Every structure is written in structure tokens, then in C-alpha cells.
Amino acid sequence: MTSIAFDLPADILAIGDAMQAFVKREVLPRHAQHAALLDDPRRRYAPDGRYSNEVYALIREVRMASAKAGFFNMCVPASIGGGGLGHLAYFVAWQSVYHTCGAHHFLAPYAIGHWAFAASAVLEHVTDAVRKRILPELLSGRQSMCFGLSEPGAGSDASMIKTRATQEGDGWRLSGRKLWTSNSPHADYCIVFAVSDAHAAAAHKGGISAFLVPTDAAGFELESVVKLFGHAGGDEGALVLDNVRVEREQLVGTLHQGFATALLGVSLGRVYNTARAIGLGRFAIELALSYVQQREAFGHPLADYQGITFPLAESATQLHAAHLMGLNAALLLDRGERAIKELSMAKSYAVEVGLEAVNRAMQAHGGMGLTNEVGLAEIWQILRIINIADGTNEILRRTIVQRLLKGDTDL
């Protein structure tokens, strides 16, 4: 039974079903076979904090299996070898992946090419020579990349970046630091954003450029792995660029207009995190609904107690609203609208209600909700992270009110 009155295109619905089948065929069996490794944060990581070789081999296997099945690059522009599907397909596919994986979600992010880790519209703006060199490996899932924008002093306000691109002959030298660069501990390439015109950057009139840098380039260093929630490792890195040489062909997009390049990925990133929050929130509520019907206390199943079930009903209502908001934003984007307000609303609302849904599911489980075996605690951590990643809720509300004050008040 569907809870949505309007019909989605048949091919979009088929993508959701196909992704669910792929996850059940390729992702969940791998997780089950290696659960002792993947479910234990103490065993996932090598001594330097990166994923162990065993774990990274599984990640690469999933990427390559997805590429072979035709899913990994389905939303990559056709001009660079992808399927050319849009934001709605991206939203439906990712929600299906996370809803299906649920607590066994560790390999889920690699079932589809993430815009910052794999081929994306950003690579439409590199030279033909660079495309020919890097695209085959990225499209196949054998290699990956990362997105170096945030810095120690530049997070929500990316205009504060200090990394410099100093002209040298026909190329540049990059020097600076990056922080919170997801996938950087294992990436083969990094899109590095740097100040190329200090006066223009200071006046907020451009002056920032993007460059594609191999992570094995001289002077490019992963200084450390950023560790979160007490884990022994992580997937975010602190990077140092010390006089890294880049040639003109490594420029991504237009010189001094790097933020235009960055914005190519922002919409997809927010669609992704909206879908991820809804998928994981739905999984958590469904898990809690099953549990409260089985668990008894004081002679009755927990489902008989409104104090336990009403919060689940409220979260289901919120997730339904978030789902509709996400679909609407994706449809607007596919129609050619910028949907700045609508996507900001969808992402900020979805990650908040997704987090609260997991919190309520944990409470319904009592002590069991905190255990590694149930898996809700780690889902909570993921959703707590994406209340900050790809635009904090506060920044998104700032964006929403700016649009409203400019007259974009259609709701």
C-alpha cells in the first residue's frame, strides 16, 4: 500500500526496487559474512586510523559490483559516461539503500557513486585529457576521490579558506590545510579549493579556484585521520598541501570561479543526506514497531502503552512529511529550478526528524537500544553527523529566511 497519492514515474519506482534487490544480493551478504569486522569499530581500522585493508577491499568490491550492475554511475551525466538520471532517481535510490540496509549500513554509502567520492557533474568541467586519464578508474569503482573545501578556520563560511594557489609559469603551487575531507584517507584524487586571487576573494567577488590533485602528488599529505565518537579511526582526514605543483590542465572549471564548481555538488549532497536520514529513520521506526509488539512488561506488550507508541507515531508522521519534502525538492531540481529554499527545508527537516526517530526507537528498545547488536546507536551517530554535514541546520535556516525575505514565500 502506498502512502503517496501522486504517481512517480515507473522507471523511478523500478530504480528503488532494483536498488533494494542489489543491496540484498551484494551488500547485505558481504556485511553478514564480515559482521565481526564491520560491526566492531575497534576492528575496522588500521593503527593509523584508516580503514584496514580488509575493510577497504570490501568497500571496493561493493563499488565495482555496483558499477558492473549499472547502478554506481546512474546519476552521473551521460556526457562523461554515466546514466544521466536526475535528482529524483538519486533520492529514491539512496532512500531505498539506507532503508534496506538499516543497522547493517556500513557498506551502504558505496552502493551508488557519491558525488564527492566518485564521478559527478563536477568532472564535466575538467579537460578532455584529464577525463581520459581518470574517468575509467572512477566509473569502474576501482578508484575514488574527495572534495577538499573545508579548512580549520573555514567550515560553514567557505569564503574564509586560506589555502593559496600561487601562479608559477603556466601552473600554480598550492599550500595550505584542509579539514573534514571525507574519503581522503583512501582517495586517489582530491578536488582542492584555493585562493587564486586574494583581492577578489577578500571582496567576495570570486578569487577561489578548484584543482584536481592526485593524492600521491609531492607535497600532498594526509596529516591525520579525524576520529569521531571515540572510534579508533574514521573516514575524514586532515590534509596538508606543501607547495604542491598543479598544471593548467588540472584546473576544474573557470579560474577564480571555484565556488560555482562547489555548488555543482551541493544539491546532490543535500538530496543524498535527505534520503539517507529518511531511509534510516524509517528503518528505526519499523524496528521499534516490531520490538514493542513482541516485548512484554507488566502483563502486556509494550505496544499497549501509549507513552511508548505515541512518540513512534509522531516520528512516522514527521518522516512522511520529510519524504514528501524530499520528493518535491528533487522534482523541482529535475525541472531546472534552483529550489534553494525547498532543498534547504527538506535537508534540515529530514535530518532532524530522522535523528529524533532513531532516538525514539532506542528509547522504545530500552537498554537493548544502546547495544551494538541492535545497531541503532551507530545509526544515531551517523544522523548526528549529518545534522552538521553538507550545511548545518542553522546555516540552512539562514538560507531559508534569506529566500523568504527576498520574496520567495511560496509554500
Write out the residue ranges for each language-model feature.
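Flexible, glycine-rich active-site loops centered on histidine and acidic residues
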Residues: 118-125, 199-200
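Long, acidic (Asp/Glu-rich), low-complexity accessory segments flanking structured domains
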Residues: 243-261
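A short core secondary-structure module
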Residues: 175-223
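Alpha-helical interface subdomain recognition
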Residues: 1-104, 110-113, 125-130, 137, ...
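Short Gly/Pro-enriched turn/cap motifs at secondary-structure boundaries
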Residues: 153-156, 180-183, 201-202, 228-235
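Flexible, small-/acidic-enriched active-site or ligand-binding loops
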Residues: 160, 216-247
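Short beta-strand-to-turn element immediately C-terminal to the catalytic PLP-Schiff-base lysine
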Residues: 124-126, 166, 192-196, 212-214, ...
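A short, Trp-centered hydrophobic/proline-enriched beta-strand micro-motif
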Residues: 141-149, 193
